[in-house]
Every structure is written in structure tokens, then in C-alpha cells.
């Protein structure tokens, strides 16, 4: 199964605190952005085994510089214009200097105007701070070991991030890249602690948890303040800074973290404890294990393949729900198989699952699944987002400055705690305040906890429906975050 590798999206901030900005028309580019919004987001493209990088604007055009130092963003095909190639030179403080390959000059600023005529990096305006613009919650795979990082507790009770999972399964496999300022990032584990250079976990960020991001041949490298690189200990597989030098053990790939959860119906969870037959056997007051956890892998809008976990976690070969004459079995070999693709529909907090032939998945009295004409009300309980970060085209979701309201145009994200409650979820900020709807349907923070439902529709995007009025939360460019959306659209979908 091909991995869902993430594109590296970022903003570039100059010495005056302004972002590299691509205007919508005329191929114009400048350094006028005060915050990281859509026009300030660039995609990094690199070729395998090449040091040349290309910066792609939201319009799809590429950044370029001519021999006179003029900077444009009008080239549609980078292969037809050598002026689009840049070399990224990492500075001692972690900032980037961007040297145009054709003319050997550095990208800099004169006020808001961009110029590419500097012959050295001594001018502060030729140094750029990098701020990631991808969703920060990811799965992280090591290139050399072809294993995923996850939080693990040793027999002695010590927590560490270990790179030994063939398949990222469970909340412990989701890591968060936290921006710490001045171009530095921290790697936060599921328990809220940060990875240190020595492999131990720290409760708060410090100098030993700061890393500079380096992109090479499409891979990510994290360099610590001592010039060493985060890697995998050959014996313990613990994530820690390695010896000097750079090898494939220091190369990582960031992948999308798909939603994983349990299907609930009639006081029981769907389970694979019976083998390949999917059946509702486990009572809801029992512990949910890997055999009750299923992953929604996006196929197209409102359609998913439902992946199951290999109980032994010793195989990369994916298995999926598959329709058979007797019902549903977990022996599908590919998400591309038509009989492994299920449509999802929503009714309040209930999910209806429609099989490829148009019939709905239902449950017999003995707990086994079969297909029928009418829908059955399931609840999909999301398990691998106990900590939630939300992103939309206008920015990240977080507390509005100076007010007990939630806004959706923040440059930096807030982390919210999600608690499952009777088919819905409560959402709490870092200060212990809960989301709820006020009389104007705005999402506010307070002591009273509102209930919300998640509806999965797109790749790593869901809609959030408020129980209080039955409406979807809608975001606006101004940051307004209100439960007044009546239909699923780009304004009511949230990247999670």
C-alpha cells in the first residue's frame, strides 16, 4: 500500500518578521505578509539525490529570479526554466539562505521588495526563518529501518519514543511538531512530553528539545543545537541524537495520520477476536484493543477503505473490510478493490456504512455483519486524537486573543483535549475551558461543556456538528468560528 507522504509546506520569514508572499495576480511576489496565511504558504519540491529545491506558490507557479536580480512567481513548469532552482544553505542559527542556482545570488529583501542579487549571506535580509505550514500531527517513518516512531513504555516503566513499528497504530504513533520560535521545532510525544537529544522525554521544551528542520531529497532531518542529527539508536531503537555525520538513520518521512477508531452498536464494539469475521462481540465497558480498532483510509469524498490491524504487527501487508456473500470479512488485500470501499453517511452522531453494491452494513442478533436495504446506526469512536489540532485555509484554530472565544485564523495552533462522551465529544483547551455555543452560535470557552460530533468526509478532514443546534462549525477569513453551517463545504471542513 503506498504511503500517504505529506508535502512539505512552510512559510519563510525575513529579518523584519515579514513573510514571503505570492500575490494572486501578475506573478508578483514580495515580503509583505504579517502572518502565515494561504498566500504565504510555499511547497518545497526536490528531486531524489539532488541539492536543488523549488518553491511552489499556492497558485501552482514557481519562484524564480533572473540575471538582474528581479524575482517573480510566474513560471508554471519548473523543468522549462532553470531560474526556478535554488540551493538551501543552512545557517548556524538554523535559518535558510536561498541561492539561485543559475545566477549564484541570494534571495533577500529591500523593505517589502524582493531582490536576488546578494553575493553573500552577511546581509540579515538574506536569511529566512522557516515555519512549517503542514498539519503538525504526523506519523514519522525512518528511512533506513523502515519503521515508525511511537511512544513506548519499558518494563522499568520509563517512557521513550522508539522506532520499531511496522504499521503506525494507536494514539501513541501520532507525534506533534511544535514550533518553539526562531526556526526551532520540538517533537512532542502522545504523553505531552518532548524528545530530548539524549532520548529521554522532557515535560517542557528546553535547549535539548530544540531541532532545526533540514530537507534533503524529499526527506526530513532534524539537527540539534550541537550540530548532531536525530536518529535511531542501533540497539534500543530509541529516538535520540546520533554520532556526528549524516546517514539514512537520520532520514525521516512524514506521513498522514489516518483516523482510527472503534465501531459501536447496541452496547458492543466491532471486533476481530473471532478471526477474519467482523462481529460485534466486545462489550463497551471492556478495554478496546487493536482487534477493535479500525482505520479509515480515504478513497474519495465520503468513501473509505476500513483497514484492520495485524494483531502481531509483523506485516506491512494491509487487510481491509471486504464484502462477501455472508457479510463482512477482514481479508481484503487493497483499498483499491471496489469490494473494499464503503461510503459513509451521517445522521446526528450516527454513522451509516454503505457497501459497494448500495446496501447498508447491518448486524445480526449473533453480532455478525450482513447487508440490508435500510441503514443501521453505528457510532464511530475516534481513538487516535485525544489531543486535537485543527487547521483550515485561514490558519489554525485557537483561542482568540483577549477573549473567551475560539478563532480559526491563528498563525500558531492550540492543542485541545478531546473526551468521548455518549456518542459525542467534549473539547477542552489547555486552561481547562470547554467549547460550547453561545446565543449567536459562536464557539466560546467556559465551564459548561458542549457536545460535538465528528463527520469524516475528505482526506484528514472532518466536519464538526454542534449537538445544541445541529449545525456545522463554519470558519471565515476574519477568524469567526461559528456553528451556523448547513452543508459540508470547504468552510466547514477541518484538517485534523
Curated annotation (Swiss-Prot):
Keywords: Actin-binding, Cytoplasm, Cytoskeleton. It holds the Pfam family Fascin. It is found in: Cytoplasm, Cytoskeleton. Gene3D superfamilies: 2.80.10.50. GO terms for molecular function: actin binding; actin filament binding; protein-macromolecule adaptor activity. The keyword Ligase does not apply. Its main location: cytoplasm. One of its GO terms (biological process) is cell migration. GO terms for cellular component: actin cytoskeleton; cytoplasm. Acts as an actin bundling protein. Belongs to the fascin family. This is Fascin. It comes from Strongylocentrotus purpuratus.
